[in-house]
Amino acid sequence: MRGFRSHSRAWLAIASLVATALVLPSPALSQDASPAASGEATRSLTREEFAAQQQEELQYTEAATPGGTFIDANTADIQTVQPLLAEEEFTIEVLDLVYDTLVGGSLWNGQIAPDQLADYWEVAADGRTYTFHLNKNATWHDGTDFTAADVQFSADALANPETGSAYTGNFIGTFESWRAIDDDTFELIATEPTYTALFEILSFYIVPKHLWENVPLAEWRNDPGASGTDPSRVVGTGPFKFQEWIQGDSVTLVRNDAYYGKVPYLDSYVLRVWPDQTAMVNALLNDEIDAAELEAPDIAAVEGTPGITVVHYPTRGFSYYEFNLDPEVTTKWQDQRVRQALLYALDRESIVDNILLGYAEVAQGTQPVVSYAYAPDQVTTNYTYDPEKATALLAEAGWTDTDGDGVVDKDGEPLAFELLYQTGSPLTDQLVAYLQDAWSGIGVAATPRSLEFPALIEATTTNPTFEMALYGFSWNASFIQDFMFGCDQYQVGFNDMKYCNEELDAIYNQAKRTFDEEARRELLIQASNIVNDEQPVAVLYFNQDHDGFRDVVQNYRPSTWGEDLTQVWIQQ
Protein backbone atom coordinates (compact mmCIF):
# COMPACT_ATOMS: atom_id res chain seq x y z
CA MET A 1 0.00 0.00 0.00
CA ARG A 2 1.65 3.21 -1.14
CA GLY A 3 0.44 5.59 1.53
CA PHE A 4 -2.89 5.59 3.29
CA ARG A 5 -6.20 5.24 1.56
CA SER A 6 -9.56 6.57 2.50
CA HIS A 7 -12.06 5.01 4.84
CA SER A 8 -12.48 1.32 4.27
CA ARG A 9 -14.29 -1.59 5.80
CA ALA A 10 -11.98 -4.11 7.42
CA TRP A 11 -12.67 -7.71 8.25
CA LEU A 12 -12.49 -7.87 12.02
CA ALA A 13 -8.75 -7.91 12.61
CA ILE A 14 -8.84 -7.97 16.41
CA ALA A 15 -5.77 -7.13 16.39
CA SER A 16 -2.31 13.09 15.50
CA LEU A 17 -1.32 14.37 13.10
CA VAL A 18 -3.98 16.14 11.10
CA ALA A 19 -3.50 15.28 7.45
CA THR A 20 -3.47 18.29 5.19
CA ALA A 21 -2.22 18.88 1.69
CA LEU A 22 1.52 19.25 1.32
CA VAL A 23 1.79 22.61 -0.41
CA LEU A 24 4.28 25.15 -1.56
CA PRO A 25 3.49 28.69 -2.59
CA SER A 26 3.23 29.44 -6.25
CA PRO A 27 4.85 32.77 -7.07
CA ALA A 28 3.38 35.24 -4.57
CA LEU A 29 0.98 32.61 -3.30
CA SER A 30 0.19 31.52 0.24
CA GLN A 31 2.06 28.83 2.15
CA ASP A 32 -1.19 27.80 3.83
CA ALA A 33 -2.48 24.33 2.98
CA SER A 34 -6.02 25.63 3.10
CA PRO A 35 -6.75 27.98 0.22
CA ALA A 36 -9.96 29.18 1.78
CA ALA A 37 -8.09 30.15 4.91
CA SER A 38 -5.94 32.63 3.01
CA GLY A 39 -8.05 33.55 0.01
CA GLU A 40 -4.98 32.95 -2.15
CA ALA A 41 -4.12 30.26 -4.66
CA THR A 42 -1.82 27.44 -3.61
CA ARG A 43 0.26 24.77 -5.32
CA SER A 44 1.19 21.37 -3.95
CA LEU A 45 4.69 20.03 -3.81
CA THR A 46 5.82 18.43 -7.05
CA ARG A 47 6.38 14.71 -7.36
CA GLU A 48 10.15 15.25 -7.27
CA GLU A 49 10.01 17.48 -4.20
CA PHE A 50 7.90 14.97 -2.34
CA ALA A 51 10.13 12.03 -3.34
CA ALA A 52 13.14 13.88 -1.93
CA GLN A 53 11.27 14.51 1.33
CA GLN A 54 10.24 10.86 1.56
CA GLN A 55 13.78 9.60 1.10
CA GLU A 56 15.07 12.01 3.72
CA GLU A 57 12.43 10.87 6.20
CA LEU A 58 12.46 7.11 5.57
CA GLN A 59 16.02 6.45 4.34
CA TYR A 60 15.20 3.57 2.02
CA THR A 61 18.18 1.45 0.98
CA GLU A 62 18.94 0.55 -2.62
CA ALA A 63 18.36 -3.09 -3.46
CA ALA A 64 21.53 -5.16 -3.44
CA THR A 65 19.80 -7.80 -5.55
CA PRO A 66 16.62 -6.65 -7.33
CA GLY A 67 14.09 -9.32 -8.14
CA GLY A 68 12.34 -12.03 -6.23
CA THR A 69 8.77 -12.51 -5.06
CA PHE A 70 7.16 -11.04 -1.97
CA ILE A 71 4.57 -13.48 -0.61
CA ASP A 72 1.90 -11.77 1.46
CA ALA A 73 -0.95 -13.49 3.27
CA ASN A 74 -4.44 -13.04 4.60
CA THR A 75 -7.26 -15.17 5.99
CA ALA A 76 -9.86 -13.72 3.62
CA ASP A 77 -9.80 -13.30 -0.12
CA ILE A 78 -10.09 -10.01 -1.93
CA GLN A 79 -13.58 -8.96 -3.06
CA THR A 80 -13.00 -7.78 -6.59
CA VAL A 81 -10.33 -6.50 -8.97
CA GLN A 82 -12.44 -3.47 -9.97
CA PRO A 83 -11.13 -0.74 -7.63
CA LEU A 84 -14.22 1.48 -7.75
CA LEU A 85 -16.18 -1.43 -6.29
CA ALA A 86 -13.72 -2.32 -3.52
CA GLU A 87 -14.95 -1.66 0.03
CA GLU A 88 -12.74 -3.50 2.48
CA GLU A 89 -9.21 -2.74 3.49
CA PHE A 90 -7.20 -5.64 2.14
CA THR A 91 -8.80 -5.57 -1.30
CA ILE A 92 -7.93 -1.88 -1.50
CA GLU A 93 -4.35 -2.52 -0.40
CA VAL A 94 -3.86 -5.13 -3.13
CA LEU A 95 -5.56 -3.13 -5.89
CA ASP A 96 -3.56 -0.07 -4.86
CA LEU A 97 -0.57 -1.84 -6.41
CA VAL A 98 -2.36 -2.15 -9.75
CA TYR A 99 -4.42 1.05 -10.00
CA ASP A 100 -3.68 4.67 -9.17
CA THR A 101 -5.60 7.66 -7.89
CA LEU A 102 -4.88 11.34 -8.49
CA VAL A 103 -3.22 11.91 -5.10
CA GLY A 104 -1.67 9.74 -2.42
CA GLY A 105 -0.40 10.09 1.12
CA SER A 106 2.90 10.33 2.93
CA LEU A 107 4.01 7.34 4.95
CA TRP A 108 5.48 9.26 7.86
CA ASN A 109 2.70 11.68 8.79
CA GLY A 110 -0.35 10.97 6.65
CA GLN A 111 -0.31 14.22 4.70
CA ILE A 112 -1.80 14.21 1.21
CA ALA A 113 1.00 14.02 -1.32
CA PRO A 114 1.78 13.98 -5.07
CA ASP A 115 2.91 10.38 -5.51
CA GLN A 116 0.16 9.16 -7.85
CA LEU A 117 -1.09 10.22 -11.30
CA ALA A 118 -0.97 13.96 -10.57
CA ASP A 119 2.58 15.36 -10.60
CA TYR A 120 1.20 18.35 -8.68
CA TRP A 121 -2.02 20.33 -8.34
CA GLU A 122 -3.15 23.88 -7.83
CA VAL A 123 -6.06 25.23 -5.83
CA ALA A 124 -7.52 28.51 -7.05
CA ALA A 125 -8.12 31.48 -4.78
CA ASP A 126 -11.82 30.54 -4.61
CA GLY A 127 -10.83 27.46 -2.59
CA ARG A 128 -13.06 25.33 -4.81
CA THR A 129 -11.21 24.76 -8.08
CA TYR A 130 -8.57 22.01 -8.10
CA THR A 131 -6.41 21.68 -11.20
CA PHE A 132 -4.38 18.47 -11.47
CA HIS A 133 -1.37 18.26 -13.76
CA LEU A 134 -1.11 14.63 -14.81
CA ASN A 135 2.05 12.63 -15.42
CA LYS A 136 2.80 12.59 -19.15
CA ASN A 137 4.65 9.27 -19.00
CA ALA A 138 1.84 7.24 -17.44
CA THR A 139 0.44 4.46 -19.62
CA TRP A 140 -2.06 1.70 -19.08
CA HIS A 141 -0.63 -1.78 -18.60
CA ASP A 142 -1.81 -2.77 -22.09
CA GLY A 143 0.29 0.04 -23.61
CA THR A 144 -2.57 2.50 -24.20
CA ASP A 145 -1.81 6.13 -23.34
CA PHE A 146 -3.31 7.40 -20.10
CA THR A 147 -5.08 10.78 -20.47
CA ALA A 148 -7.41 13.07 -18.58
CA ALA A 149 -10.27 11.48 -20.52
CA ASP A 150 -9.75 8.38 -18.38
CA VAL A 151 -10.03 10.51 -15.25
CA GLN A 152 -13.25 12.12 -16.46
CA PHE A 153 -14.71 8.74 -17.38
CA SER A 154 -13.83 7.36 -13.94
CA ALA A 155 -15.33 10.40 -12.19
CA ASP A 156 -18.54 10.01 -14.17
CA ALA A 157 -18.71 6.33 -13.18
CA LEU A 158 -18.00 7.03 -9.51
CA ALA A 159 -20.67 9.73 -9.41
CA ASN A 160 -23.36 7.42 -10.79
CA PRO A 161 -25.14 5.30 -8.14
CA GLU A 162 -25.67 2.58 -10.77
CA THR A 163 -21.98 1.71 -10.45
CA GLY A 164 -22.57 0.55 -6.89
CA SER A 165 -19.52 2.19 -5.32
CA ALA A 166 -19.51 2.84 -1.57
CA TYR A 167 -17.67 6.11 -2.25
CA THR A 168 -20.33 7.68 -4.50
CA GLY A 169 -22.12 9.57 -1.73
CA ASN A 170 -19.16 11.55 -0.47
CA PHE A 171 -17.79 12.21 -3.95
CA ILE A 172 -20.98 13.75 -5.33
CA GLY A 173 -21.53 15.53 -2.04
CA THR A 174 -18.12 17.19 -2.32
CA PHE A 175 -17.74 18.03 -6.02
CA GLU A 176 -20.23 19.75 -8.28
CA SER A 177 -18.37 19.38 -11.59
CA TRP A 178 -15.27 17.98 -13.25
CA ARG A 179 -13.71 18.07 -16.69
CA ALA A 180 -10.67 17.16 -18.74
CA ILE A 181 -9.09 20.45 -19.78
CA ASP A 182 -6.65 18.70 -22.11
CA ASP A 183 -4.92 15.31 -22.21
CA ASP A 184 -2.66 16.19 -19.28
CA THR A 185 -4.88 18.42 -17.12
CA PHE A 186 -7.97 17.64 -15.09
CA GLU A 187 -10.19 19.98 -13.09
CA LEU A 188 -12.42 19.25 -10.10
CA ILE A 189 -14.69 21.96 -8.70
CA ALA A 190 -15.95 21.51 -5.15
CA THR A 191 -19.41 22.69 -4.15
CA GLU A 192 -17.73 24.95 -1.58
CA PRO A 193 -14.30 25.36 -0.01
CA THR A 194 -13.81 22.34 2.25
CA TYR A 195 -11.01 20.94 4.32
CA THR A 196 -11.80 17.40 3.14
CA ALA A 197 -11.92 17.74 -0.66
CA LEU A 198 -8.60 16.01 -1.31
CA PHE A 199 -9.41 13.22 1.14
CA GLU A 200 -12.51 12.38 -0.89
CA ILE A 201 -10.40 11.55 -3.95
CA LEU A 202 -8.08 9.15 -2.13
CA SER A 203 -10.64 6.47 -2.98
CA PHE A 204 -11.13 7.77 -6.53
CA TYR A 205 -9.28 5.14 -8.55
CA ILE A 206 -8.82 5.76 -12.25
CA VAL A 207 -9.91 2.97 -14.58
CA PRO A 208 -9.30 2.71 -18.36
CA LYS A 209 -12.04 4.28 -20.42
CA HIS A 210 -11.21 2.15 -23.45
CA LEU A 211 -11.96 -1.07 -21.55
CA TRP A 212 -15.01 -0.02 -19.53
CA GLU A 213 -16.94 2.56 -21.57
CA ASN A 214 -19.03 -0.05 -23.38
CA VAL A 215 -20.02 -1.94 -20.22
CA PRO A 216 -23.28 -0.76 -18.60
CA LEU A 217 -22.52 0.54 -15.11
CA ALA A 218 -24.97 -1.84 -13.46
CA GLU A 219 -23.03 -4.76 -14.97
CA TRP A 220 -19.58 -3.72 -13.77
CA ARG A 221 -19.69 -5.91 -10.66
CA ASN A 222 -20.15 -9.08 -12.72
CA ASP A 223 -17.81 -8.16 -15.56
CA PRO A 224 -14.74 -10.39 -16.21
CA GLY A 225 -12.67 -7.29 -15.48
CA ALA A 226 -14.06 -7.29 -11.94
CA SER A 227 -13.92 -11.04 -11.33
CA GLY A 228 -10.47 -11.35 -12.88
CA THR A 229 -11.55 -14.16 -15.19
CA ASP A 230 -10.32 -12.09 -18.13
CA PRO A 231 -6.90 -10.73 -17.10
CA SER A 232 -6.73 -8.61 -20.25
CA ARG A 233 -9.48 -6.45 -18.74
CA VAL A 234 -7.72 -5.93 -15.40
CA VAL A 235 -5.55 -3.04 -16.51
CA GLY A 236 -4.23 -0.22 -14.37
CA THR A 237 -1.39 2.30 -14.38
CA GLY A 238 0.25 1.20 -11.11
CA PRO A 239 3.65 -0.32 -10.30
CA PHE A 240 2.41 -3.91 -10.61
CA LYS A 241 0.40 -5.60 -13.36
CA PHE A 242 -2.35 -8.09 -12.70
CA GLN A 243 -1.57 -11.66 -13.72
CA GLU A 244 -4.00 -14.00 -11.99
CA TRP A 245 -6.63 -14.30 -9.27
CA ILE A 246 -7.44 -17.86 -8.19
CA GLN A 247 -10.38 -17.14 -5.96
CA GLY A 248 -9.96 -18.48 -2.45
CA ASP A 249 -6.31 -19.28 -3.10
CA SER A 250 -4.06 -16.50 -4.41
CA VAL A 251 -3.56 -13.26 -6.31
CA THR A 252 -0.44 -12.77 -8.45
CA LEU A 253 0.91 -9.43 -9.67
CA VAL A 254 4.08 -8.82 -11.69
CA ARG A 255 6.34 -5.78 -11.91
CA ASN A 256 5.38 -3.02 -14.34
CA ASP A 257 8.70 -2.11 -15.95
CA ALA A 258 7.01 0.81 -17.73
CA TYR A 259 5.77 2.40 -14.51
CA TYR A 260 6.03 6.19 -14.54
CA GLY A 261 7.12 6.34 -10.90
CA LYS A 262 9.49 4.26 -8.81
CA VAL A 263 9.72 0.88 -10.58
CA PRO A 264 9.53 -1.92 -7.99
CA TYR A 265 12.60 -3.94 -7.10
CA LEU A 266 10.44 -7.07 -6.82
CA ASP A 267 9.66 -9.28 -9.80
CA SER A 268 6.27 -10.14 -8.38
CA TYR A 269 3.84 -9.87 -5.50
CA VAL A 270 1.73 -12.85 -4.43
CA LEU A 271 -1.13 -12.82 -1.95
CA ARG A 272 -1.88 -16.25 -0.53
CA VAL A 273 -5.23 -16.87 1.15
CA TRP A 274 -5.23 -19.14 4.20
CA PRO A 275 -8.25 -20.87 5.74
CA ASP A 276 -7.64 -19.43 9.20
CA GLN A 277 -5.26 -17.45 11.38
CA THR A 278 -3.47 -20.50 12.77
CA ALA A 279 -2.60 -21.83 9.33
CA MET A 280 -1.35 -18.42 8.23
CA VAL A 281 0.90 -17.95 11.26
CA ASN A 282 2.32 -21.46 10.83
CA ALA A 283 3.10 -20.59 7.22
CA LEU A 284 5.09 -17.57 8.40
CA LEU A 285 6.97 -19.65 10.96
CA ASN A 286 7.77 -22.23 8.25
CA ASP A 287 9.03 -19.59 5.75
CA GLU A 288 6.19 -20.32 3.33
CA ILE A 289 5.22 -16.65 3.27
CA ASP A 290 7.12 -13.41 3.83
CA ALA A 291 4.67 -11.43 5.95
CA ALA A 292 1.42 -11.75 7.88
CA GLU A 293 -0.76 -9.64 10.12
CA LEU A 294 -0.73 -11.18 13.58
CA GLU A 295 -3.39 -11.36 16.25
CA ALA A 296 -2.56 -10.84 19.91
CA PRO A 297 -2.25 -14.55 20.83
CA ASP A 298 0.27 -15.06 18.00
CA ILE A 299 2.71 -12.40 19.14
CA ALA A 300 4.65 -14.20 21.87
CA ALA A 301 5.47 -17.21 19.70
CA VAL A 302 6.34 -15.26 16.57
CA GLU A 303 8.27 -12.46 18.25
CA GLY A 304 10.82 -14.88 19.66
CA THR A 305 11.43 -16.69 16.38
CA PRO A 306 14.88 -16.17 14.81
CA GLY A 307 14.69 -14.57 11.38
CA ILE A 308 11.31 -12.89 11.95
CA THR A 309 10.65 -9.28 12.96
CA VAL A 310 7.40 -8.12 14.55
CA VAL A 311 6.33 -4.46 14.52
CA HIS A 312 3.44 -2.92 16.45
CA TYR A 313 1.72 0.36 15.67
CA PRO A 314 -1.56 2.16 16.35
CA THR A 315 -4.05 2.32 13.52
CA ARG A 316 -6.93 4.46 12.32
CA GLY A 317 -9.10 1.41 12.77
CA PHE A 318 -11.54 0.17 15.37
CA SER A 319 -13.70 -2.86 16.06
CA TYR A 320 -17.44 -2.47 16.56
CA TYR A 321 -20.86 -3.96 16.18
CA GLU A 322 -23.62 -2.20 14.26
CA PHE A 323 -27.38 -2.25 14.67
CA ASN A 324 -29.88 -2.38 11.83
CA LEU A 325 -32.11 0.59 12.68
CA ASP A 326 -34.51 0.02 9.79
CA PRO A 327 -37.88 -0.56 11.53
CA GLU A 328 -39.07 -2.57 8.53
CA VAL A 329 -36.40 -5.16 9.36
CA THR A 330 -36.56 -5.10 13.17
CA THR A 331 -37.98 -2.82 15.85
CA LYS A 332 -35.72 -4.14 18.63
CA TRP A 333 -33.19 -1.33 18.36
CA GLN A 334 -35.42 1.73 18.02
CA ASP A 335 -34.96 2.77 21.67
CA GLN A 336 -31.40 3.97 22.27
CA ARG A 337 -31.60 2.78 25.87
CA VAL A 338 -31.57 -0.79 24.55
CA ARG A 339 -28.50 -0.07 22.44
CA GLN A 340 -26.78 1.58 25.40
CA ALA A 341 -27.65 -1.33 27.68
CA LEU A 342 -25.77 -3.78 25.50
CA LEU A 343 -22.55 -1.77 25.80
CA TYR A 344 -22.88 -1.28 29.57
CA ALA A 345 -23.11 -5.08 29.82
CA LEU A 346 -19.60 -5.51 28.39
CA ASP A 347 -16.39 -5.42 30.40
CA ARG A 348 -14.27 -3.94 27.64
CA GLU A 349 -11.23 -3.64 29.91
CA SER A 350 -11.42 -7.40 30.29
CA ILE A 351 -11.79 -7.83 26.52
CA VAL A 352 -8.63 -5.80 25.93
CA ASP A 353 -6.66 -7.45 28.74
CA ASN A 354 -7.73 -11.07 28.32
CA ILE A 355 -8.62 -11.46 24.65
CA LEU A 356 -6.36 -8.84 23.07
CA LEU A 357 -3.63 -9.25 25.71
CA GLY A 358 -3.41 -5.51 26.16
CA TYR A 359 -2.82 -4.72 22.48
CA ALA A 360 -5.73 -2.28 22.06
CA GLU A 361 -7.33 0.75 23.68
CA VAL A 362 -10.86 0.72 25.09
CA ALA A 363 -12.82 3.16 22.94
CA GLN A 364 -14.25 6.33 24.42
CA GLY A 365 -16.19 7.76 21.50
CA THR A 366 -15.51 7.26 17.81
CA GLN A 367 -12.20 9.13 17.33
CA PRO A 368 -9.20 6.75 17.44
CA VAL A 369 -6.01 7.28 19.39
CA VAL A 370 -4.12 8.59 16.34
CA SER A 371 -6.76 11.25 15.60
CA TYR A 372 -6.21 14.91 16.45
CA ALA A 373 -9.80 14.80 17.79
CA TYR A 374 -9.14 11.94 20.21
CA ALA A 375 -10.50 13.23 23.54
CA PRO A 376 -11.41 10.40 25.95
CA ASP A 377 -11.69 12.86 28.82
CA GLN A 378 -14.50 14.75 27.04
CA VAL A 379 -16.96 11.92 26.39
CA THR A 380 -20.47 12.68 27.62
CA THR A 381 -21.36 9.02 28.20
CA ASN A 382 -18.71 6.69 29.59
CA TYR A 383 -19.78 3.08 29.17
CA THR A 384 -17.94 1.54 32.09
CA TYR A 385 -18.89 -2.04 32.87
CA ASP A 386 -22.20 -1.90 34.74
CA PRO A 387 -24.57 -4.84 34.16
CA GLU A 388 -26.99 -3.51 36.78
CA LYS A 389 -27.35 -0.28 34.84
CA ALA A 390 -27.77 -2.31 31.66
CA THR A 391 -30.64 -4.24 33.24
CA ALA A 392 -32.23 -1.01 34.50
CA LEU A 393 -32.05 0.60 31.05
CA LEU A 394 -33.73 -2.42 29.49
CA ALA A 395 -36.49 -2.24 32.10
CA GLU A 396 -36.98 1.49 31.47
CA ALA A 397 -37.41 0.65 27.79
CA GLY A 398 -40.02 -1.97 28.64
CA TRP A 399 -37.87 -5.11 28.35
CA THR A 400 -38.29 -7.47 31.33
CA ASP A 401 -38.41 -11.24 31.72
CA THR A 402 -42.16 -11.77 32.09
CA ASP A 403 -42.18 -15.54 31.51
CA GLY A 404 -39.10 -16.58 33.50
CA ASP A 405 -37.23 -18.10 30.56
CA GLY A 406 -34.11 -16.00 31.20
CA VAL A 407 -34.66 -13.72 28.19
CA VAL A 408 -36.23 -10.28 28.55
CA ASP A 409 -39.26 -9.62 26.40
CA LYS A 410 -41.62 -6.82 25.42
CA ASP A 411 -45.14 -7.21 24.07
CA GLY A 412 -44.51 -10.93 23.75
CA GLU A 413 -41.30 -10.59 21.72
CA PRO A 414 -38.03 -11.82 23.26
CA LEU A 415 -34.89 -9.69 22.92
CA ALA A 416 -33.19 -12.30 20.76
CA PHE A 417 -31.26 -11.67 17.57
CA GLU A 418 -28.65 -13.01 15.16
CA LEU A 419 -25.10 -11.63 15.36
CA LEU A 420 -23.21 -11.87 12.06
CA TYR A 421 -19.43 -11.91 11.92
CA GLN A 422 -16.62 -13.02 9.65
CA THR A 423 -15.29 -16.54 9.83
CA GLY A 424 -11.61 -17.47 10.07
CA SER A 425 -10.23 -15.91 13.26
CA PRO A 426 -9.99 -17.81 16.57
CA LEU A 427 -9.68 -14.48 18.33
CA THR A 428 -12.89 -13.21 16.75
CA ASP A 429 -14.58 -16.44 17.80
CA GLN A 430 -13.39 -15.75 21.35
CA LEU A 431 -14.77 -12.20 21.26
CA VAL A 432 -18.13 -13.36 19.91
CA ALA A 433 -18.39 -15.99 22.63
CA TYR A 434 -17.73 -13.30 25.23
CA LEU A 435 -20.40 -10.99 23.77
CA GLN A 436 -22.94 -13.79 23.73
CA ASP A 437 -22.21 -14.72 27.35
CA ALA A 438 -22.17 -11.13 28.65
CA TRP A 439 -25.48 -10.30 27.01
CA SER A 440 -27.00 -13.52 28.29
CA GLY A 441 -26.23 -12.20 31.76
CA ILE A 442 -28.71 -9.34 31.26
CA GLY A 443 -31.32 -11.51 29.58
CA VAL A 444 -30.42 -10.80 25.96
CA ALA A 445 -30.06 -13.77 23.58
CA ALA A 446 -27.56 -13.39 20.74
CA THR A 447 -27.15 -16.22 18.24
CA PRO A 448 -23.81 -15.90 16.42
CA ARG A 449 -23.49 -16.81 12.74
CA SER A 450 -20.16 -16.67 10.94
CA LEU A 451 -19.97 -15.87 7.24
CA GLU A 452 -17.26 -15.58 4.63
CA PHE A 453 -16.50 -11.91 4.12
CA PRO A 454 -18.31 -11.46 0.75
CA ALA A 455 -21.44 -12.99 2.27
CA LEU A 456 -21.15 -10.68 5.27
CA ILE A 457 -20.97 -7.66 2.97
CA GLU A 458 -23.99 -8.96 1.05
CA ALA A 459 -26.02 -9.37 4.24
CA THR A 460 -25.25 -5.89 5.56
CA THR A 461 -25.13 -3.74 2.42
CA THR A 462 -26.58 -5.21 -0.77
CA ASN A 463 -29.47 -6.91 1.01
CA PRO A 464 -29.47 -5.39 4.51
CA THR A 465 -31.75 -7.76 6.39
CA PHE A 466 -29.29 -8.30 9.26
CA GLU A 467 -30.06 -7.47 12.90
CA MET A 468 -26.52 -6.94 14.21
CA ALA A 469 -23.09 -7.36 12.61
CA LEU A 470 -19.56 -7.33 13.99
CA TYR A 471 -17.00 -5.48 11.88
CA GLY A 472 -13.79 -3.50 11.75
CA PHE A 473 -13.40 -0.15 10.01
CA SER A 474 -10.64 2.32 9.21
CA TRP A 475 -11.15 6.09 9.04
CA ASN A 476 -9.41 8.28 6.52
CA ALA A 477 -7.00 10.85 7.89
CA SER A 478 -9.50 13.71 7.90
CA PHE A 479 -11.28 11.86 10.74
CA ILE A 480 -14.58 13.41 9.63
CA GLN A 481 -16.91 10.46 9.91
CA ASP A 482 -19.98 11.33 7.88
CA PHE A 483 -19.38 8.51 5.39
CA MET A 484 -20.50 6.09 8.12
CA PHE A 485 -22.92 8.23 10.13
CA GLY A 486 -24.33 10.70 7.58
CA CYS A 487 -28.03 10.47 6.73
CA ASP A 488 -27.28 10.42 3.00
CA GLN A 489 -24.74 7.59 3.24
CA TYR A 490 -27.23 4.72 3.52
CA GLN A 491 -26.50 2.32 0.62
CA VAL A 492 -24.17 4.83 -1.10
CA GLY A 493 -21.64 4.95 1.73
CA PHE A 494 -20.96 2.91 4.85
CA ASN A 495 -24.12 3.71 6.82
CA ASP A 496 -25.39 0.13 6.99
CA MET A 497 -27.43 1.04 10.06
CA LYS A 498 -29.87 3.42 8.32
CA TYR A 499 -28.97 5.91 11.05
CA CYS A 500 -29.89 9.56 10.67
CA ASN A 501 -29.36 12.58 12.91
CA GLU A 502 -29.73 15.93 11.18
CA GLU A 503 -27.92 17.80 13.95
CA LEU A 504 -24.96 15.48 13.47
CA ASP A 505 -25.03 16.04 9.70
CA ALA A 506 -24.89 19.80 10.29
CA ILE A 507 -21.85 19.41 12.56
CA TYR A 508 -20.02 17.30 9.97
CA ASN A 509 -20.80 19.83 7.25
CA GLN A 510 -19.51 22.65 9.43
CA ALA A 511 -16.35 20.66 10.23
CA LYS A 512 -15.66 20.19 6.53
CA ARG A 513 -15.81 23.96 6.04
CA THR A 514 -13.65 24.69 9.09
CA PHE A 515 -9.97 25.16 8.28
CA ASP A 516 -8.85 26.07 11.79
CA GLU A 517 -7.66 22.81 13.34
CA GLU A 518 -8.67 23.52 16.92
CA ALA A 519 -12.16 24.68 15.93
CA ARG A 520 -12.59 21.62 13.72
CA ARG A 521 -11.38 19.40 16.55
CA GLU A 522 -14.10 20.74 18.85
CA LEU A 523 -16.73 20.00 16.23
CA LEU A 524 -15.49 16.44 15.79
CA ILE A 525 -15.57 15.89 19.55
CA GLN A 526 -19.21 17.06 19.54
CA ALA A 527 -19.98 14.67 16.68
CA SER A 528 -18.26 11.78 18.43
CA ASN A 529 -20.32 12.39 21.56
CA ILE A 530 -23.60 12.35 19.63
CA VAL A 531 -22.77 9.00 18.04
CA ASN A 532 -21.42 7.63 21.32
CA ASP A 533 -24.61 8.67 23.13
CA GLU A 534 -27.03 7.37 20.51
CA GLN A 535 -25.14 4.12 19.78
CA PRO A 536 -26.03 3.31 16.16
CA VAL A 537 -22.78 1.39 16.44
CA ALA A 538 -20.89 0.35 19.57
CA VAL A 539 -17.17 1.03 19.21
CA LEU A 540 -15.48 -1.61 21.35
CA TYR A 541 -11.83 -0.66 21.10
CA PHE A 542 -9.24 1.02 18.91
CA ASN A 543 -6.94 -1.42 17.19
CA GLN A 544 -3.23 -1.89 17.14
CA ASP A 545 -1.71 -3.76 14.20
CA HIS A 546 1.02 -6.35 14.54
CA ASP A 547 2.93 -7.32 11.42
CA GLY A 548 5.38 -10.20 11.35
CA PHE A 549 7.80 -10.51 8.46
CA ARG A 550 10.94 -12.38 7.54
CA ASP A 551 14.22 -10.52 8.09
CA VAL A 552 15.23 -11.11 4.47
CA VAL A 553 12.51 -8.62 3.48
CA GLN A 554 14.24 -5.23 3.27
CA ASN A 555 12.64 -1.75 3.27
CA TYR A 556 9.35 -3.22 4.51
CA ARG A 557 7.97 -0.67 6.95
CA PRO A 558 4.29 -1.14 7.74
CA SER A 559 2.90 1.74 9.75
CA THR A 560 -0.22 3.70 10.67
CA TRP A 561 -0.09 5.33 7.23
CA GLY A 562 0.72 2.29 5.09
CA GLU A 563 3.83 0.93 3.42
CA ASP A 564 5.55 1.20 0.02
CA LEU A 565 6.06 -2.13 -1.73
CA THR A 566 7.92 -0.51 -4.63
CA GLN A 567 10.82 -0.06 -2.19
CA VAL A 568 10.80 -3.62 -0.85
CA TRP A 569 13.53 -6.05 -1.86
CA ILE A 570 14.48 -9.58 -0.83
CA GLN A 571 17.95 -10.20 0.57
CA GLN A 572 19.49 -13.24 -1.12
Which residues fall in each region the model found?
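Surface-exposed binding/hinge segments that line
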Residues: 169-219
